[in-house]
Amino acid sequence: MLVRLLRVILLASMVFCADILQLSYSDDAKDAIPLGTFEIDSTSDGNVTVTTVNIQDVEVSGEYCLNAQIEGKLDMPCFSYMKLRTPLKYDLIVDVDEDNEVKQVSLSYDETNDAITATVRYPEAGPTAPVTKLKKKTKTYADKKASKNKDGSTAQFEEDEEVKEVSWFQKNWKMLLLGLLIYNFVAGSAKKQQQGGAGADQKTE
């Protein structure tokens, strides 16, 4: 009788384009034992419904593998290993993608349930970071060097940043000027000494 009923359900699902989810449990010593049958269908407004077709009257207590199968679409042997006990007060959570296709199922205990209750879980959109326009900055060579030396780490520059390069003459003009002054002073002193020595020689003659 049960086999005939399942055949009728499968035939009806093929006509109405609904999916039939078979939920079962098993251990190492026995074949899969049915827990329930659920019909998954898409509504005209784009949502997904899960209807309980049949819940098996079983007596179970212990740890088992849970299995889920949608013929031709989903095969999840031992998708969870958990402790089962009767009465079957569980939530059957059916996860679907953006195209309302079943991707996975899970089972969790809920003491408020009278039997296995199926619910649909849709994908949640993640948080969207606000778009921040980067400001354009101009840094001199000195700023870049100071940033690199700060805390002994390499500075990280913001995007769209321009570094103004300075020529060697612009960086070292003070040293050049100081060297030129020293050179003129030394050269002038040497010239005066030469002139003074030449005058003394003329007087001696």
From Swiss-Prot:
One of its GO terms (cellular component) is EMC complex. Keywords: Endoplasmic reticulum, Glycoprotein, Membrane, Signal, Transmembrane, Transmembrane helix. Its main location: endoplasmic reticulum. GO terms for biological process: protein insertion into ER membrane by stop-transfer membrane-anchor sequence. The chain crosses the membrane at residues 173-190. It is a single-pass type I membrane protein. The keyword Glycoprotein applies. Glycans are attached at residue 47. Residues 18-172 are lumenal. Residues 1-17 form the signal peptide. Residues 191-205 are cytoplasmic. It is found in: Endoplasmic reticulum membrane. The keyword Zinc-finger does not apply. Component of the ER membrane protein complex (EMC). Part of the endoplasmic reticulum membrane protein complex (EMC) that enables the energy-independent insertion into endoplasmic reticulum membranes of newly synthesized membrane proteins. Preferentially accommodates proteins with transmembrane domains that are weakly hydrophobic or contain destabilizing features such as charged and aromatic residues. Involved in the cotranslational insertion of multi-pass membrane proteins in which stop-transfer membrane-anchor sequences become ER membrane spanning helices. Present with 1600 molecules/cell in log phase SD medium. This is Endoplasmic reticulum membrane protein complex subunit 10. The gene is EMC10.
